[in-house]
């Protein structure tokens, strides 16, 4: 066994190496035009929706491998991630390769991090912490918007948090598309549970009102400690989705995002100026870059 491979096995045994650890896992090699990598043969998120994501290693630096089937999804994710390479708050694409069956994305690894779905399930969030998370999320989404893209699948599973620094990163750009503010969209590429009511009722949506809706859904679910997430069907059934343990302005923000009538929903550009976030701009530092600086790696 080579020394890099031995180092990688130590990474896999480290309890801080994400929340799924496999001490006896096998390791395989994979080569690109630039580097030799070692990759775990068992998914990081076994049994979930991300059984195509694996932990890897290159010269002492942990990385993440994501396999995307060429039969199911075209290579748009690579194009989008390259375009967003220097965007604060967006997970970095380090390198890309492919084989006959898969697009293979090699992505930065954020140590001591977890997705927001598991974070809010296992930790009861106080309003101030949840508010800071939501505010960061909005800033990142607007950064993506400024680059001419819409993520298309904003949900707590696609947001990871550095547990120590409380800094957010957006991941999984498989549903991202070019921004088109004026034309209705008839195909839903994101997660059905986060679909907006206009698509449910009429079969179309506009990108920005959909984004506001999904932000509202994430905001609701951040307060769902040890409980299943709320989704559109729960709201349409008339269930009370407004958290009890937040301020009136917090409740109003969620209500404004989750208004059934898209024309009365909070505007995309008005998100950061909502009264709930008053004074937060001074408190939140600019979104810092986590992990290794991989700028200009992708050409």
UniProtKB/Swiss-Prot annotation:
ATP binds at residues 45-53, 66. Residues 39-277 form the Protein kinase domain. It is found in: Virion; Host cytoplasm. Pfam families: Pkinase (PF00069). Gene3D superfamilies: Transferase(Phosphotransferase) domain 1. The active site is at 153 (proton acceptor). InterPro entries: Kinase-like_dom_sf, PIM_Ser/Thr_kinase, Prot_kinase_dom, Ser/Thr_kinase_AS, Ser/Thr_kinase_asfivir. It catalyses: L-seryl-[protein] + ATP = O-phospho-L-seryl-[protein] + ADP + H(+); L-threonyl-[protein] + ATP = O-phospho-L-threonyl-[protein] + ADP + H(+). Induction: Expressed in the late phase of the viral replicative cycle. Transmembrane segments: none annotated. Essential for viral replication. It may mediate the virus progression through DNA replication. Belongs to the protein kinase superfamily. Ser/Thr protein kinase family. This is Serine/threonine-protein kinase 1.
């Amino acid at each position: 066994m080579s020394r890099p491979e031995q180092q990688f096995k130590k990474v896999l045994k480290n309890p801080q190496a994400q929340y799924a650890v496999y001490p006896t896992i096998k390791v395989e090699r994979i080569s690109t035009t630039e580097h030799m990598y070692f990759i775990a043969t068992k998914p990081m998120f076994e049994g979930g929706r991300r059984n195509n994501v694996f932990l890897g290693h290159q010269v002492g630096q942990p990385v993440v491998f994501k396999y995307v089937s060429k039969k199911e999804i075209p290579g748009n994710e690579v194009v989008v991630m390259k375009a967003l390479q220097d965007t604060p708050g967006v997970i970095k694409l380090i390198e890309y390769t492919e084989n006959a069956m898969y697009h293979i994305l090699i992505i930065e690894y954020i140590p001591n991090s977890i997705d927001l779905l598991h974070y809010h399930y296992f930790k009861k969030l106080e309003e101030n912490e949840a508010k800071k998370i939501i505010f960061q999320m909005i800033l990142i989404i607007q950064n993506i918007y400024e680059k001419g893209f819409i993520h298309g699948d904003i949900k707590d599973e696609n947001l990871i948090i550095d547990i120590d620094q409380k800094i957010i990163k957006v991941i999984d750009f498989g549903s991202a598309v070019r921004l088109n503010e004026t034309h209705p969209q008839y195909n839903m590429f994101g997660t059905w549970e986060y679909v907006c009511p206009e698509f449910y009722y009429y079969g179309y949506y506009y990108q920005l009102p959909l984004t506001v809706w999904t932000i509202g859904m994430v905001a609701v679910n951040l307060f769902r400690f040890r409980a299943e997430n709320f989704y559109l069907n729960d709201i349409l059934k008339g269930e009370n989705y407004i958290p009890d343990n937040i301020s009136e302005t917090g409740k109003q923000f969620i209500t404004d995002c989750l208004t059934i009538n898209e024309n009365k929903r909070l505007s995309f550009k008005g998100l950061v100026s909502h009264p709930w976030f008053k004074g937060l701009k001074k408190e939140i530092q600019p979104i810092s870059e986590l992990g290794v600086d991989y700028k200009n790696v992708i050409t």
